A protein has these predicted regions:
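Glycine-rich loop at the start of a catalytic domain that most often binds anionic cofactors/ligands
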Residues: 1-9
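Ordered, amphipathic secondary-structure segments that act as subunit-interaction surfaces
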Residues: 17-54
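A conserved regulatory-domain signal marking ACT and ACT-like small-molecule sensing domains
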Residues: 9, 14, 22-26, 40-43, ...
Length: 167
C-alpha cells in the first residue's frame, strides 16, 4: 500500500479530500498538523473480502466505529460494511442507509417522501438476513438532502439504524 500511495489516499479521504485534490500528496503533514492520529496495519480480513480491502477504524474517546471498503480497480471503490452492517455503495452519490425488521411498505414510504420533496433515486439495494429477517437498505441519490429531510428520514422509530452519507 505504501508504494502505490494508497496510505496517502486513505488518509486524504479521512480528511475529506476528493480524489482529484492536490493536497492528498501532503495528507500525512496535514493530518499531523490537525493532530489526527493514524496508524496503518497490514491485516488479513479473511476470505469473505476482496484482496484489496481496507478496514478504517475511527477511535473516539467514548466509542469506536469502522468502515470496510474495497478497491475494485480503475480508481473505483465500494463500501461493504459499516460497524458490522453489510452494505453496498460506491460513495459517489449521497446515500441513505437503513436497517430495519422486515416489513412491507418501507421502501415505498421512503421513495414517496423523496419523490414529494423532488429528489431522484440513483439506485436502491437491499441485503436481507433470512435468519433474523433484518434488512439493510441502501439508497443512493442524485443530490444532497436538505437537513430537515435528513432528520425526518433518519429519526423514524421503524429503523434499527438510519444514517445519511453526504458527498
Amino acid at each position: 500500500y505504501k508504494g502505490h500511495g494508497t496510505d496517502r489516499a486513505l488518509l486524504g479521504g479521512i480528511l475529506g479530500f476528493k480524489t482529484y485534490d492536490d493536497r492528498i500528496r501532503d495528507a500525512f503533514k496535514i493530518a499531523d498538523s490537525k493532530k489526527i492520529n493514524y496508524e496503518f496495519v497490514a491485516t488479513d480480513l479473511g476470505e469473505d473480502f476482496h484482496p484489496n480491502t481496507v478496514k478504517i477504524s475511527f477511535v473516539y474517546e467514548d466509542h469506536e466505529e469502522y468502515v470496510i471498503g474495497s478497491s475494485i480497480g480503475g480508481g473505483n471503490m465500494i463500501i461493504v460494511d459499516i460497524n458490522g452492517i453489510q452494505v453496498e455503495f460506491d460513495g459517489t452519490h449521497p446515500t441513505l442507509l437503513f436497517r430495519y425488521n422486515e416489513q412491507k411498505g418501507i421502501i415505498s414510504e421512503i421513495s414517496s417522501i423523496l419523490y414529494k420533496n423532488d429528489y431522484n433515486i440513483e439506485s436502491i439495494n437491499t441485503i436481507k438476513d433470512d435468519l433474523t429477517e433484518i434488512v439493510n437498505l441502501t439508497i443512493e441519490l442524485d443530490q444532497n438532502l436538505s437537513i430537515d429531510l435528513v432528520k425526518k428520514l433518519t429519526t423514524n422509530s421503524k429503523f434499527l439504524m438510519a444514517k445519511y452519507v453526504e458527498v
